[in-house]
């Protein structure tokens, strides 16, 4: 089953420790059913010094969260909503807000 959340979507966490937080999707992991959201679900990683990380040490970064725990925030009505798909008369597919019926973006 495909994910209805895409990279750069604004989403709101609807359950769990970070309930109510809003952030932008940095990456989707469709095989795992997870997404990585900016500013949500930080974990600490022990990083060995390498060329990329000169100092190393303990680094905080975002960890994946299940996609079923987030909802897309509609850019038109600014409410968390389910996402539907619709085919326009021109033949192109678009994502649609289930609350206000407005087009979110192209698929």
Swiss-Prot record:
InterPro entries: KOW (IPR005824), Rib_uL2_dom2 (IPR014722), Ribosomal_uL24 (IPR003256), Ribosomal_uL24_CS (IPR005825), Ribosomal_uL24_KOW (IPR041988), Translation_prot_SH3-like_sf (IPR008991)
One GO BP annotation of this record: translation
GO molecular function: rRNA binding; structural constituent of ribosome
PROSITE patterns attached to this UniProt entry: RIBOSOMAL_L24 (PS01108)
The keyword Transferase is assigned to this record: no
CDD domains membership: KOW_RPL26
UniProt keyword annotations, A-Z: Ribonucleoprotein, Ribosomal protein, RNA-binding, rRNA-binding
HAMAP family, per database record: Ribosomal_uL24_B (MF_01326_B)
Family designation: Belongs to the universal ribosomal protein uL24 family.
Biological function: One of two assembly initiator proteins, it binds directly to the 5'-end of the 23S rRNA, where it nucleates assembly of the 50S subunit. One of the proteins that surrounds the polypeptide exit tunnel on the outside of the subunit.
Full protein name: Large ribosomal subunit protein uL24
Organism lineage string: Bacteria, Thermotogati, Thermotogota, Thermotogae, Kosmotogales
Gene name of the encoded protein: rplX
């Amino acid at each position: 089953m495909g994910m209805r959340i895409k990279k750069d979507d604004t989403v709101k966490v609807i359950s769990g420790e970070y309930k109510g937080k809003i952030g932008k999707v940095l990456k989707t992991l469709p095989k795992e059913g997870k997404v990585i959201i900016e500013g949500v679900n930080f974990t600490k990683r022990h990083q060995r010094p390498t060329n990329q990380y000169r100092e190393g040490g303990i680094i905080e970064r975002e960890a994946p969260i299940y996609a079923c725990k987030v909802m897309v925030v509609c850019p038109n009505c600014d409410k968390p909503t389910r996402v539907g798909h619709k085919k326009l008369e021109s033949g192109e597919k678009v994502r649609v807000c289930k609350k206000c019926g407005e087009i979110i973006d192209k698929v």
